[in-house]
Amino acid sequence: LNSKKFPNSRGIFGRQDITNASKGSVNVGKMTVYVAIGRSKFLPPILLCNARQAARVYAVGESVKTAAVGGGTGKEMLRQTGFNPFIYFSPDKDTRMLQQIMEKHPDFQFVLLNTGHIGEMKIPKEMSQEALNWFFRAADPKLECEELPNGMWMRKADRKFYPDFDVFLANLNEWEADRTNYLKNHPDFKSYTFIQ
């Protein structure tokens, strides 16, 4: 890789340089999207978040520990506000700013991409790619989604992963309760009520 272009050892490639990339236009106009990547054990491949849920996802910053943050195996859970140990402001201020931006700018979108598991099934990279392609190409993604009790939006097509939807909703409630407890006890979120 050209280190002048990729100083952090990550690569960006033009679509014309990728053999099996689609040849059609991918111009989708101006979009402002924050894609958070996590590894859940039960969430669907993609979820759309409202301002409150985006703030909660950002505040908890739940992912897995990898070599990039200290030689992890990819299995140990890690919680880091903003998914980043180098956020500019305090965790509280950074999270507030994200929520305020989303509330003031309805066109700003926040997506949670699950690259972990759905039950025993490992989510393959092709499924993640398909989910993102769907999101960026859909005229209005929410028209193909249903709103969950916690305020997130899930693709109707992804119900196929949950033969017993009540079990999924119970897991979702448990997940929410765990995140709420974490934030309430986090020293940097003294005024947690703004994302309850």
In which residue ranges do the predicted regions lie?
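Conserved NTP phosphate-binding and transfer environment spanning the P-loop NTPase/kinase superfamily
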Residues: 5, 11-196
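Phosphate/diphosphate-binding loops
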Residues: 1-2
